[in-house]
Each structure stands twice: as C-alpha cells, then as structure tokens.
C-alpha cells in the first residue's frame, strides 16, 4: 500500500533531523537496510551448536547459562571462550566468585596468557568494569561468573543480619538497561552464569525453581541455556565424568526449546568425540555392530571409550564425520534427538 506523498516528505525530513542529531542510521526503513546474518561463537559442543540454530551463541547479545551446582556452567563458558579465542577474539572473565581454575581453563583450550580476568570486590565494581571494557570496542566476549556473586556494596558494608530486599535485582536491572545497546553496537557477546534457587512458599503449578538476580536478565537475554547433570560416566568402576543435558529455554534468533546432550570428562571438559559417536550412530553415519563401532571401512574401536580415544588422535577423521553429520541434519531441520541412553551403560 502506497504512503501519502506528504507523509513521505514529513518522514524523510524527520529522518534527516534524527541523523543530524544522533548520527546516520539512527532511524532507517527496514526495507532499505540490508538484513545482516547473525554471527555466532561456537559453544565447543556439536549438539548445542545445532540446537542453538545458528551454530553457536549469537554475537552482540546477552546470554544466560544457568543450572544446579556442578552441572557444567563454567565449563561450557570456558569452552565458548576457547572457541572465540581460536578465531582471534579478545575475551574477558569477570570472576565475581573468585574461583577461576586457571589450570583447568588451560586444559580446555583457553589462552590464559591473553585472557583478561577481573576479581571484583562488589557487584557495582564488576558491572562498572564490564561497561568500561565493552564501551572500549576491543572485546568480543565477556563472561560474568556469577550473577549470585554480584553482591551490592551496601550488603557488603552492612552487618550480617541486615535485610537488603531487592537490592541485587535493582542493580542488575540498572546495569542491563545501560549495557544492552552498547553490546549490540560493539558486537560484544555477554554471558552471565547464574545459579538456581527454590521459590519460597511455592504451591500449585509451575516450576519451584528460579534464577538469582531478579527478572531483568530473563527479559534482556536473547538466549537462555539450562544445563543439568543427568548421569555419571564410569569406566572400570572409576568415575570419569558426567553426562549433561542442555535445553535452550529461550532463543530470540532461532526456534527455542531444542535440547542436546554431551559428556563432560573430568579434567578435559566437553567430549566432542562422544558427540560425534552419538550423532553418527543416530544418523547411520557410524555403524554399530555389537560393541564395535566403525565408519565406512575403518574400525573406530570396541566400545564407546575406545572409539572416542581413536577420534581424539585422528582429528582429520573426526572433522570428516562432523561434516557428514552437519550435512545430514541440515541447517533448517529440527535437531534429531539423541538416544535416551549413551552407547555404554551409565549410572
């Protein structure tokens, strides 16, 4: 439907005035603006990258990763840092919990020599540092670990029994209002790690769980990832890792509610090789005959752990199977669910 000529002139004049005051591009017609592809940073997990719909977490957006204790939240975040650094990105880690294990981060592939780290004393200090480095335009990814540890200064300075109702929620709300536009402009990804709490006096329907820091983060986050430990991985009765399940509970850049599963091995992080085997078997790319696993004419090994060890050594073969998996699934198809149980018995 054509717009009236007088209205067109009025709108054009208004756009010129806005461009003069706020800079060119402050107000544009969507039809005149080229639609940009959403860039992403890989999570280090094949299944989660596929579940997110764009190959990883979106750049220039706020991401929330939450779950129970020891579910793999920090591990997943460190993998994202490692993937960002592999592509020349500059990353920062705001360690509000004062619990960053540098040696573990290095084992996951993080370039710790070039990782910017801050261990702030208060929530205000953490968020001021976050805003300053983001506005610099030189940062590609910032991880805040965690929202629960962003303690307001008034709470730290007060006595142990003082009540500070809603103080942290107001702090988060104020910070997110200030930082969201800057993140988009600077194309900086911000990941908040968050913890779970139980709702007080929860009765009736709905989940009794909630995340810390109020509701602002739930609204401002473009992607929210729920990660849970679902099983223990054992080899010869030795506990060697955990099986994790992730659900994309909110996604503004692709369809939400997709899920993925992967192994988190102690001291090693996410097992890409385990995902290759799981998806390969599900998609009939990897053959499973009894305990033996094979790809085309090549034997991968007897049992899942042996096959994982071979793929870990043969990177070219692993990358070849990954390519086949991505081609088989296709970028526009629903993610195929993994088997209910991994290929070897777990407790």
Curated annotation (Swiss-Prot):
Q: By its UniProt entry, which NCBIfam families does this protein fall under?
A: tigrfam_recA
Instruction: Please report which protein family the annotation says this sequence is part of.
Output: Belongs to the RecA family.
| Cellular location(s) | Cytoplasm
* Alphabetized UniProt keyword annotations: ATP-binding, Cytoplasm, DNA damage, DNA recombination, DNA repair, DNA-binding, Nucleotide-binding, SOS response
Keyword Metal-binding assigned to the entry: answer is no
Q: Which GO terms describe its biological process?
A: DNA recombination; DNA repair; SOS response
Descriptive protein name: Protein RecA
Q: What's the source species for this entry?
A: Helicobacter acinonychis (strain Sheeba)
* Chief subcellular location: cytoplasm
Q: Which InterPro entries match?
A: AAA+_ATPase, DNA_recomb/repair_RecA, DNA_recomb/repair_RecA_CS, P-loop_NTPase, RecA-like_C, RecA-like_N, RecA_ATP-bd, RecA_C_sf
Under the heading PROSITE patterns, the entry gives: RECA_1, RECA_2, RECA_3
Q: What's one GO MF term for it?
A: damaged DNA binding
Which superkingdom, per the lineage?
Answer: Bacteria
**Gene Ontology annotations for the cellular component aspect, listed alphabetically:** cytosol
Q: What does this chain do?
A: Can catalyze the hydrolysis of ATP in the presence of single-stranded DNA, the ATP-dependent uptake of single-stranded DNA by duplex DNA, and the ATP-dependent hybridization of homologous single-stranded DNAs. It interacts with LexA causing its activation and leading to its autocatalytic cleavage.
